[in-house]
Amino acid sequence: MVERTEQGRLIRQYFIKCEEALHKVAPTVTKQLRNELKARLKAQSYHKPMCAALEVARMEQGKTTLPRHYTNESNMLNRIVLAGMTAKQWAQHHGVMGNPRDAMSELQLEHLSYLEQTNTTLIELGMGYPARKDKLAGLSQKWLVQRMEAKQ
């Protein structure tokens, strides 16, 4: 009934074009959101084992593990991934409210996951904080180069 006027036809055509555009964009956006969620869950799944490894390593040395020790590990990795900033600093700089990981890009989350997984292994091998920090910085650069080469 709306189509009986010229304005009605224009409105209908507008909505048809909107639906066509949505059908073109929706699969791409859905795929991107799915990949971001996978990266976020992966990063989350490696954090707990890293913390557990840290606690075991410190216990074997006869040391207690305080909350600041976990924070130090997270800050070390975040500084590598987030250009020298802790997650808190990065969130403030980018105006992020809530959990900074929820606002990180897929690449940042994958990078963080890689570093958490590698850090867990280095902790289990008995490597100290300064040595792990240096090793992770070097491995991070290699990982980034490999990622860039793979995209070309």
Give the residues covered by each predicted segment.
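Positively charged, phosphate-engaging catalytic surfaces used for nucleic-acid and nucleotide handling
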Residues: V2-Q152
